[in-house]
Amino acid sequence: MRATKQLRRLWRREGGFGPTALGVIASPLAALFGTAVRTRNFLYNVGALPASSAALPVISIGNLAVGGTGKTPLSGWLIRQLIRRGWKPALVTGGYGEDEILLHRKWNPQVPVIVAQRRLDGARESLELGRDIVVVDDGFQHRRMKREVDIVLLSPAHRFPPRLLPRGPFREPLEALRRAQLVLVIAKGGCELESARALVAELRRMPGIPQVEIFSFQPGEWETLDG
């Protein structure tokens, strides 16, 4: 628990002996991790690692960093928009958080929620259930599955420039945004709007980055998941 606390302090770039000492250890590990991530992405980009089709349209909602950036509420909102337009969506998730699964089932009870660590298998299962489109929660790094749209979320709460795991919370460098179709900077309430606008402006100056917009939502009242 103490190590986790110090790691969070390192990610927030706080001073002190603990984060500084941990940073000395984490820096070479982050460099190795970055090399592995870039190599993997390169192999997918050139086709050396294959990507397979789910045989129906796939929209992936993902992020670059670990932790919450609003993927779950955005996925639920997107599913409702698809239903209104006549689609029959399914939601595929890795199932790492039980609360997220319960929320999806509460928000859209008529929509199948498929738990599959191999997102491609989950997408194919949705086809067997008569679905005609899939929304994948946390699918950006699952490159084995082809998708029509990649939406990537960023939080203004994360410090920039990004640092890769374990030195920082990022799973991929910013250059990975170039394979997305849309980048959304999430503003949770009015207090984050100013910092979200600043991050959007910074991202729009980067070459090769796709469309970048702000997605703002207001937290609602507490509600029990058992109704």
Give the role of each language-model region.
Residues 91, 113-115, 214:
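A structural preference for short, hydrophobic beta-strand core positions in alpha/beta folds
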Residues 95-207:
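Phosphate/Mg2+-binding loops and adjacent switch elements
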Residues 88-89, 150, 212:
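Hydrophobic anchor at the start of a short beta-strand
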Residues 63, 155-156, 217:
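Active-site donor-binding loop signature of nucleotide-sugar glycosyltransferases
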Residues 41-96, 189-192:
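Walker A (P-loop) phosphate-binding motif
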Residues 2-57:
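A transmembrane-helix-recognition feature enriched in membrane-embedded lipid enzymes
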